[in-house]
């Protein structure tokens, strides 16, 4: 259900067993959890403190979900975030226990976004340096082995979800030999528009 950079966060319960004991989940085959994405907290370089110490800024709410699946479902096919099975099995729940009745249980987004009882924390961008190291380790076939598409997609998401600063831009350009003129223009535009305050993209 979760990747190595994701964690299930329980707001009220001390264990997954306690959380699942809620009677609202008794007839659900799937539980859908919204993402909450952590920003880089303006960390350019790797910081060896614990995640809870490093990331104090509010999480960014996200409509996309990851799905917890009940065992012993034989007709299950899995695709990225959510299951896809026979239309006959059509009861799923959001994390509060509220039911979603649909024959499209593979839906990958749930609105309104609800982080009331549980959610998936996605530590996607922990620092600029760690993002660069990810690039240098290589990339998957998701982008058709096209490094330019990979860089554009990930850098675009990074600067859309984190504060743009000259320090970050300069570091990326230095390490990747990649011209970020577009983000440099956005940085100065924000600086002028918001009276010298560094803004989110």
Region locations from a protein language model:
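Catalytic-site signature of metal-activated, phosphate-bearing donor transferases
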Residues: 10-201
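Short beta-strand-to-loop acidic/aromatic patch adjacent to the donor-nucleotide binding site
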Residues: 1-9
């Amino acid at each position: 259900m979760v990747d190595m950079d994701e964690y299930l966060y329980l707001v009220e319960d001390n264990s997954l067993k306690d959380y699942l004991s809620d009677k609202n989940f008794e007839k659900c085959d799937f539980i859908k959890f919204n993402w909450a994405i952590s920003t880089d907290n303006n960390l350019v370089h790797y910081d060896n403190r614990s995640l809870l110490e490093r990331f104090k800024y509010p999480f960014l709410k996200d409509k996309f979900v990851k799905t917890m699946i009940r065992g012993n479902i034989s007709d299950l096919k899995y695709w990225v975030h959510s299951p896809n099975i026979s239309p006959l099995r059509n009861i799923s729940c959001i994390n509060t226990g509220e039911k979603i009745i649909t024959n499209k249980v593979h839906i990958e987004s749930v609105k309104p976004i609800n982080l009331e009882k549980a959610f998936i924390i996605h530590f996607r961008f922990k620092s600029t340096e760690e993002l660069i190291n990810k690039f240098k380790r290589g990339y998957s076939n998701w982008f058709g082995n096209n490094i330019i598409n990979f860089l554009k997609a990930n850098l675009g998401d990074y600067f859309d979800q984190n504060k743009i600063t000259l320090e970050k831009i300069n570091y990326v350009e230095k390490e990747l030999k990649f011209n970020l003129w577009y983000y440099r223009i956005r940085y100065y535009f924000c600086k002028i528009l918001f009276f010298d305050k560094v803004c989110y993209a």
